[in-house]
Regions:
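Generic enzyme active-site microenvironment
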Residues: 50-51, 162-163, 197-200
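Distinct, well-ordered alpha-helical segments
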Residues: 32-36, 40, 64-68, 140, ...
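Catalytic-core regions built around general acid/base machinery
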Residues: 66-75, 146-154, 213, 244-245
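Active-site clefts of carbohydrate-active enzymes
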Residues: 228-234
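Aromatic- and acid-rich polysaccharide-binding/catalytic face
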Residues: 192-203, 221-225
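Active-site acidic/histidine proton-transfer and metal-coordination neighborhood
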Residues: 15, 93-195, 205
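N-terminal pre-domain/capping segments
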Residues: 1-120, 191, 207, 219, ...
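Short, glycine/acidic-enriched loop or turn micro-motifs at the edges of active sites
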Residues: 55, 167, 202, 231
Length: 246
């Protein structure tokens, strides 16, 4: 929501949603201000039951605890947060490099403590760039092996990493881009702790064919994110037929 439009929006309109929508922290800054606690209270006032925060892992423990207290008071549930430092500019999981793998697994272990602190169940994983020096099938094996090790860490805690394919236009060169690819990886990892985050916006740009792909991947999808194309704006503002998708 843009600041210029904020004055036009009534604030006392709690709504009973049919789906468990989770706004991202920061979406309502124009209405609720910059303070995360004020934003959580605003979300609850509007009828939302969940929220997500990609940056939760990097917030101070004090703020995490304060946010958890607010969540409990307002009956809000934590959605996804990003579990690790995403390698936007280098191959990490696809490379098979042992040091890269160990660094990733160390961050997964640390994110368990964050998840416990904020009562989160899902954490986002992006496998980083392709390694253009290796055949894609070897890279896939490297990613699968690393994710299996991550599942060994997560399973005892009942936590789920959701691997997110991202589109080639916004994030050129990434290893994981398509839903069939994510589906095959999850099938190979074969763990309740490795599922798909299906971002409808990204997949519309990357591959389209949204409803058949969702149906084909359904058993491996644990989480959806939404946004319309072009521009990653509100649903119904662009080309995606969200009425049919929902």
């Amino acid at each position: 929501i843009l600041k210029a439009n904020a004055s036009q929006i009534p604030l006392n309109m709690p709504h009973q949603y049919n789906l468990n929508y989770a706004p991202h922290l920061g979406m309502f800054k124009a209405l609720a201000g910059n303070d995360p606690i004020d934003q959580l209270n605003f979300m609850a006032d509007q009828g939302f039951k969940s929220f997500e925060d990609n940056d939760m892992r990097t917030r101070s423990v004090k703020l995490q605890e304060k946010m958890t207290q607010t969540m409990q008071q307002r009956n809000l549930r934590m959605g996804v947060f990003v579990a690790h430092d995403i390698a936007w500019k280098r191959p990490n999981l696809a490379s098979g490099d042992v040091d890269e793998q160990n660094a990733f697994l160390k961050e997964i272990k640390a994110s368990i403590e964050v998840a416990k602190r904020v009562n989160a169940k899902w954490m986002t994983v992006v496998p980083g760039l392709k390694d253009f020096r290796q055949n894609i099938d070897y890279q896939t094996v490297n990613v699968i092996n690393t994710l299996k090790k991550a599942c060994d860490i997560l399973e005892p805690h009942g936590l789920i990493m959701v691997i997110e394919p991202l589109n080639f236009k916004s994030h050129p060169g990434l290893f994981l881009t398509e839903s069939p690819q994510a589906n095959s990886i999850c099938k190979a990892v074969d763990s309740s702790s490795c599922k798909i985050l299906f971002d409808v916006y990204h997949q519309q740009i990357q591959e389209g064919n949204l409803i058949p792909n969702i149906e084909s991947c359904w058993d491996e999808i644990a989480y959806f994110q939404i946004g319309d194309n072009p521009g990653r704006n509100e649903p119904y503002s662009g080309e995606i037929n969200y009425k049919n998708i929902f």
